[in-house]
Amino acid sequence: PYINGKRRPHIPLYFLTSNFSFSGAEALPFAFQSLKRAVVVGETTGGGAHAWIGKIATDRFYVHVPNAYSSDPKTKKDWEGVGVKPDIEVPAKDALLRAHIEALEKLAKSDTAKTTLYNWHLETAKSKLEPSIVLDHATLHSYTGEYGSRRVTLENGKLYLHSNGSKLEMLPMSKTLFRIEEVNILRVNMVLEKGIVTAMERRLAFGDSYLVPKAK
């Protein structure tokens, strides 16, 4: 049937899968993967391509009888018993982030007017996938203090930025660079001179940055 709207055959598509994806949840990624129209990200699926109906065989037995199946019209293959193997294999819990990374990498290359913004969010996504950076107490404590109208505190091993009445957790991306989950266009970089923290650099996703000296 006719579907109203603009065709967009070149827009990248991603399917997220797990080993619990089964039957109908496998059909679409299988079909689009076979057509090379989408990227499957996650885990190999459960492998249920053959439909069945239940039949009472005797007064003691009830059987499942296969009555339909889906297959690739070219190869005649299906995913029964083997599942749909992902193009990018990662644990299911990481599939969405991994798909974000793939999409952002393509956007950063294709849309040069927004490369800076896409690379910003790409760095954020990659930092979420990497093992958490652990900073020692002395390093964390050295970052606390007053920075203009803002303040950094240390509570239970975590740094918090207090700004305009908000208390925002600072998540480390490196030894000095922190992202703010609640404000994804803001990062905080601690500036050191000869090992001493002298300022906070507020970086914004669009490329701007502001240096705020630390109070003595």
PLM features: residue spans?
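C-terminal "post-core" interaction segments
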Residues: 1-141, 194, 200, 207, ...
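Short acidic-hydrophobic surface loop/beta-edge motif
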Residues: 53-58, 147, 178-180
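Short, surface-exposed beta-strand/loop "edge" segments at domain boundaries and coil↔beta transitions
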Residues: 71-74, 166-170, 184-190, 204-212
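Calycin-type beta-barrel ligand-binding domains and close structural analogs
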Residues: 156-160, 203-216
